[in-house]
Amino acid sequence: MKEVLTIILPKIIPLTFTFQCIPHNGKSALKKSIPIKTKGWREPNVQFIIVHDKNSSDCKKLKEELYNLIDSSKRTNTLVRIVCTELESWFLGDLNAVEKGYNTNLSAYKAKALFRNPDIILNAKQELRKLIPTYQPISGSNTISQFMDITKNNSHSFNVFVSGVKNLVKEPLD
């Protein structure tokens, strides 16, 4: 996730913003870290974006759970976004980026219903490996995300993420 965010956030946020991606070793480590970081971060004008894979969770319940962890810090300038269902769904939503990253032709797949709504794919990583057998999560994230177009992605969760980040950075800071 960090690799992708490091590459795509500069395409979304103004140049006047800086950001830091903090990876966590698993979802429980992230959940434990949220209240600590949101309460303890003393630097002024800091905004938090928390990104979490949906996997098999109920999206709305997961998002509510993460916002509840933030509530105790009284920090309002925080955005929670859920990737449905895996990060690879975002890649499958932009097959042009996959084509460019792996120098292959995927035009036969672009019209398929499955790739017009990649968020419904239960195992996006496996589906991506069917298209790109050499795909590996970390190197593949770097390879594909550098070609991602933030304005042309069939993943609804990606588009909601982009929209949320844009709205967060245009709001006045506390």
Predicted regions and their residues:
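C-terminal accessory helical subdomains adjacent to catalytic cores in phosphodiester-
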Residues: 2-22, 28-49, 54-174
